[in-house]
Curated annotation (Swiss-Prot):
Name of the protein this chain belongs to: Glutamate--tRNA ligase
A GO-annotated cellular component: cytosol
Family statement: Belongs to the class-I aminoacyl-tRNA synthetase family. Glutamate--tRNA ligase type 1 subfamily.
Entry note: cofactor: Binds 1 zinc ion per subunit.
Cofactor(s) listed in the protein's UniProt record: Zn(2+)
EC class name: ligase
Subunit structure: Monomer.
Function of the molecule: Catalyzes the attachment of glutamate to tRNA(Glu) in a two-step reaction: glutamate is first activated by ATP to form Glu-AMP and then transferred to the acceptor end of tRNA(Glu).
Gene Ontology BP, a term: glutamyl-tRNA aminoacylation
Recorded catalytic activity of this chain's protein: tRNA(Glu) + L-glutamate + ATP = L-glutamyl-tRNA(Glu) + AMP + diphosphate
């Protein structure tokens, strides 16, 4: 049975690259009717926080990614200690008492010579008695894995094919820190083995970790899982996606009014393309049905804010059920304008749904329905050219209407045009300035026909 895992570290908000990794791991498990495991990798005591863990969990739920099993590495330290001891007892690991300042000095010397640092194995051959004496005296230590000399580690990557790496360059690497906490490459192996993970899908930055992990699997007698290393995501300038490219976290898009279905859709097609899909708008169910790891492109994917913005607009305009759209919009609008009547909002959404691509954009574009706005500079300039009597005429005409509709507003404008020398454009501009404070935005006949009549008259009164 297929078992995949997503193993984020709670050291920051979830990056879009991590989210895509989680989505691909999720799709692979669901496509094969397997199990999807969420594991929080919080062994970095200094940088891991509960706030970021909660954020990751919340963002995954928001994206619609549900897991079957949940683990937290900080609750498994006793297990890691047990397996570290097994490696020591079997001769695959050893205590290292080298001082950190000496290691740092060696590292600096290697860098100065243009070489990568490799631990020289100083403590590799200490006698059992020497080790016991130093442990009894309370001397600080780390535990290092003993890397076999002259070995080539090979594995078949599900995306890249065969990868072979000479492990001689690694040196004996640390698996347990001096504070007793275990290192990523060690705990990832223990957890993946004990959780019976069959397929590990992760970013290509982990390729160099894989040989180290395979050595640990072999030393403990575990069968390694299959590995798939995803290509990196680039910004539109073809450099690795980072904060300088703008929003790069799931949290950013959530807070800026994107809907989860659109972000899920965009990320799952970022580097994955299938002839079976053949379209840019795809549901989670379709993604599960058609997902094949072999269809992942080996070349880096380019993240486009514009493409995601467009796709989100498609979801808002055409795909989201009205009740979901209302619910999502309501939360954004009430943050900006206070309590919003749901029936009033239904009228607004019915008439304006095609006018915005994000909820945050909707907050600004729908402002005239909830709050008066001060005139912008263009509106001020236009107002200076308008005969102020038009506002009084508009007020009189609208007062006489039983209700305001787009059709009878045309009649209002026509009546004013007949009784004055004003052009229709001037009358419409006057109405727009009074109601919205701007010459741009949603059609003014739509705004005027949805706003309560008394509110329309009140705003006109400011200019009479």
């Amino acid at each position: 049975m297929v078992r995949t895992r997503f193993a984020p570290s709670p050291t920051g908000y979830m990056h879009l690259g991590n989210a895509r990794t989680g989505i691909f791991s999720y799709l692979f498990a669901r496509h094969h009717n397997g199990t999807f495991v969420l594991r929080i990798e919080d062994t970095d005591r200094e940088r891991s926080t509960k706030e970021f863990e909660d954020s990751i969990i919340e963002d995954l739920k928001w994206l619609g990614i549900e897991w079957d099993e949940f683990y937290r590495q900080s609750e498994r330290f006793d297990i890691y200690k047990e397996y570290a001891k097994k490696l020591i007892d079997s001769g695959h690991a050893y205590y290292c008492f080298c001082k950190e300042e000496d290691i740092e000095k060696q590292r600096e010397e290697a860098y100065a010579q243009g070489k990568a640092y490799r631990y020289p194995g100083t403590c590799r051959h200490l006698s059992k008695e020497d080790v016991e004496d130093r442990l009894k005296s309370g001397e600080s230590y780390v535990i290092r894995f003993k890397v076999p000399d002259g070995q080539i580690v090979s594995f078949e990557d599900m995306i890249r094919g065969n990868i072979s790496i000479n492990v001689d360059d690694f040196g004996d690497f640390v698996i347990v820190r001096s504070d007793g906490s275990s290192v990523y490459n060690f705990v990832a192996v223990i957890d993946d083995a004990l959780m019976k993970i069959t397929h590990v899908i992760r970013g290509e930055d982990h390729i160099s970790n894989t040989p180290k992990q395979i050595l640990i699997y072999e030393a403990l007698g575990f069968k390694p899982p299959e590995f798939a290393h995803l290509p990196v995501i680039l910004g539109e300038d073809r450099t690795k996606l980072s904060k300088r490219h703008g929003g790069v976290s799931v949290r950013f898009y959530k807070e800026n009014g994107y809907c989860p279905e659109a972000l899920f859709n965009y990320l799952c097609l970022l580097g994955w393309s299938s002839e079976k899909v053949g379209k840019e708008v795809i549901s989670k169910e379709e993604a599960v049905k058609y997902f094949d790891i072999k269809d992942i492109n080996l070349s880096p994917a380019v993240f486009s804010h514009d493409k995601l913005y467009w796709l989100n607009g498609v979801y808002i305009r055409e795909i989201l059920p009205e009740d979901r759209l209302l619910e999502d919009l309501l939360s954004f609008l009430e943050k900006a304008y206070g309590t919003v009547d749901i029936e009033y909002l239904k009228k607004i959404v019915k008439a304006t749904r095609k006018e915005y691509n994000t909820y945050l954009e909707a907050v600004e574009k729908l402002r005239p329905f909830f709050k008066e706005k001060e005139l912008d500079e263009v509106a001020k300039e236009e107002l200076s050219k308008i005969d102020r009597k038009v506002f009084e005429l508009l007020k009189q005409e609208i007062e006489s209407l039983e209700e305001i509709t787009p059709e009878n507003l045309k009649g209002v404008v026509k009546n004013i045009q007949k009784s004055t020398s004003l052009k229709p454009k001037d009358v419409w501009h006057a109405l727009r300035i009074a109601l919205t404070g701007s010459l741009e935005g949603i059609a003014i006949d739509v705004i005027a026909s949805i706003l309560p009549k008394e509110e329309v008259l009140k705003r006109l009164s400011r200019y009479t």
